[in-house]
Curated annotation (Swiss-Prot):
Belongs to the RRF family. Gene3D superfamilies: 3.30.1360.40, Ribosome-recycling factor (1.10.132.20). This is Ribosome-recycling factor. GO terms for biological process: translational termination. The keyword Cytoplasm applies. Responsible for the release of ribosomes from messenger RNA at the termination of protein biosynthesis. May increase the efficiency of translation by recycling ribosomes from one round of translation to another. Its main location: cytoplasm. It comes from the Bacteria. It is found in: Cytoplasm. Residues 143-163 are annotated as: Disordered. The lineage of its organism: Bacteria, Bacillati, Bacillota, Clostridia, Eubacteriales. Pfam families: RRF. GO terms for molecular function: ribosomal large subunit binding. The keyword 4Fe-4S does not apply.
């Protein structure tokens, strides 16, 4: 029972960190990254569809994204979806491809992004702590129902705390790396 709880805890914490990584990848850091476009939906024959399912997205230069739609008739729809998004980038359309030039970030925008980063990292830490709490409650109920001994409960809680500390440390290192990337001029 304890091993099941521990493996479930670790799995849920890993998913939280993976979610944080994806979330932070979509933040604009002054460099072109196809993940920036993941959340943008394009109206494709009445269906909201992610850009990466409608086009090839390449990064030919550090601050340039090129979107090559497989169906040339949807270029205008893709362009409109990008303009509506909160990316703050104006697409240029030459009829075949859409180019997104990623502008340099201003100092003010960098500081805003760092605030957003810290908020999302804190949300991830809270999620990890909630997972710890849920797992500890499972151990306590197992002890109450005499399914596990008091010693096993204590050892299980210690192991869960170690996992929690390890994952929170990982969240902090992800945050520091992304902060450094954003504050780089």
């Amino acid at each position: 029972m304890i091993k099941d709880i521990l493996s479930d805890t670790e799995e849920r914490m890993k998913k939280t960190i993976e979610h944080l990584r994806k979330d932070l990848a979509s933040l604009r850091a002054g460099r072109a990254n196809p993940a920036m476009l993941e959340k943008i939906m394009v109206d494709y024959y009445g269906q909201p569809t992610p850009i990466n399912q409608l086009a090839n997205i390449t990064v030919p230069e550090a601050r340039l994204l090129v979107i090559q739609p497989w169906d040339k008739t949807i270029i205008a729809s893709i362009e409109k979806a990008i303009m509506k998004s909160d990316l703050g980038i104006n697409p240029s359309n030459d009829g075949n491809v859409i180019r997104l030039v990623i502008p340099q970030l201003t100092e003010e925008r960098r500081k805003e992004l760092v605030k957003v980063l810290r908020k999302r990292a804190e949300e991830a830490r809270v999620a990890v702590r909630n997972i710890r709490r849920d797992s500890n409650e499972l151990l306590k109920s197992g002890e109450k129902e005499k399914l596990i001994s008091e010693d096993d409960n204590k050892k299980g809680m210690d192991d869960i705390q170690k996992e929690t500390d390890r994952h929170i440390k990982e969240i902090d290192s992800i945050l520091q790396g992304k902060e450094k990337e954003i504050m780089e001029v």
